[in-house]
Amino acid sequence: MPSINPLANALATLYNNEMRRNKQALITPASKLIISVLRVMQKEGYIGEFEYIDDGRAGKIIVQLLGRINKCGPISPRYPLDYNGLLRLPDYIRKYLPSKEIGIIIISTPKGVMSHRDGIREKIGGVTLGYVY
């Protein structure tokens, strides 16, 4: 059966494996968007290395977990945010993070997938994808 939201499945897989104290997580199916989100999480220090495996179907990703994820998940529906929206962090974003200094909101911008802090730094808005803390 095809997956309705592969990004939501990937984030749920990461969270479930983290709560089970596993050292690795196997994400399937793989996509460019999931790989971009994993790069942002890796850059922020939430996950370790990850490897894409082409199995001739949709692909798989093996992620090394560091034990730093307390909660992660998708933001659905994907809210559009302009630069001013990122500055004042609207109420529907505030409900996903425990504090303004803890965690990141992952956004998709015309310059690629990045955290909300990078979006503020580059003065660019985008569409919310998920959250991690």
UniProtKB/Swiss-Prot annotation:
Coiled coil: none annotated. Keywords: Ribonucleoprotein, Ribosomal protein, RNA-binding, rRNA-binding. Pfam families: Ribosomal_S8 (PF00410). GO terms for biological process: translation. The keyword Transferase does not apply. One of its GO terms (molecular function) is rRNA binding. It comes from the Archaea. One of its GO terms (cellular component) is ribonucleoprotein complex. Part of the 30S ribosomal subunit. NCBIfam families: PRK04034.1 (NF003115). Belongs to the universal ribosomal protein uS8 family. One of the primary rRNA binding proteins, it binds directly to 16S rRNA central domain where it helps coordinate assembly of the platform of the 30S subunit. This is Small ribosomal subunit protein uS8. It comes from Sulfolobus acidocaldarius (strain ATCC 33909 / DSM 639 / JCM 8929 / NBRC 15157 / NCIMB 11770). The lineage of its organism: Archaea, Thermoproteota, Thermoprotei, Sulfolobales, Sulfolobaceae.
